[in-house]
Amino acid sequence: MLADFTRRVSRKTPETRASKGFWRFGSRIQVDINTVNNVSSHPVVENNNVNENSENEPLPPFLTLSSQIDSAVPDSGFCDKLSCTFTPTGICDDRLREGLSMLSEPNARGYYLKRLGGKNDRIYRQSFEILKMGGERHMALLQMNPRRTEHHFIRFELNPSEIGMDGVYEVKRVFKALFGERFKVDLSDGNITRLDAAVDVRKIRPDDLMVFSTSARQSGLFQRSFDTSGHETFVTETHTVGSLSSDYFARCYDKAAQVWRVKAEEADGLITRVEVKLKPRTEDGATLRVGDIRNARNPFGALMVAYYPTSGESNYVFNLLVAAARSVGAERALKMIPDRRVRAKYWNLLRDSVPNWWCPEKHWDEVLESLKATGLFSRDIFRKK
């Protein structure tokens, strides 16, 4: 019965670099009894990955390593991307032009501004990259002089975790040179337009997890098929919750696989990243002030991360729900149940499988601490009120 459980969804199959497998938004997916008994459908370690010369190639580690569910451990939460707007006070146009001219020339300071154009000038008239010399590594995007007067005069965007403390230090030097010593005070009265919070969990892959929201949201599940021993094995590489165009969008994805495909580098073991893109707002829908960051809702709080429950011999309907969750995601599988009481019962059963390491409050506090450590903001705004 369960071995014949199938579901057809739409196809999309761009090839990936790692093997002869490919991404699919869906396919005909067979779920065998092992799926219900909480056995992940990982590719076997056997190497039958063949290149264009019909030669066997070693499989990338993210396909061959086994998850260690009992040993899974999260790193500290961090900010993966930050975008803010603010209006500096007491800065005259002549001084700003002089500062931009001076910083636009490569110099001994170790950084410089590169003028951008094109699509970057649609909202702001001037856009610059802050680049680190000796390789021209991108550190931040800086925009100014908006076309609409209701916008703040300055907008910047950076990735604190990628550029590190040294990179953030250089960005602060640019801000001081352009906007003066009190830029942190002015920034506190600005707005946070985007904040991406993330936490990496090691020794586990997304295929071992269910991800769903505490409230009704659009969700998706993206799988990768891998041809091994003459049959296709499906591995979940990404869970999504929310819409890209909304104020809230979450992803739980295989970071090791992404690093392999994008950078052709091997990650240090299995890494699953839980990442939330948030546009912080107040209760009345206004964009959140930087100084009120402590009042921002915890983006991890609306997210449930759980293991697949062990099947019960008597509750075959719940077993079918778990099997369906592997095919279409827990959120959509729950919506297939029309009876609210039954749906609520099963939702609570799924919540019982949340691992001890998933701690939304702790992860969010770590994200705020990482922002505080950058020194980009006044320390007062991080005090608990």
Residue ranges and their predicted role:
Residues L349:
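Alpha-helical DNA-recognition elements
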Residues L2-M336, D352-K385:
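Structured, helix-rich domain cores that form ligand/interaction pockets
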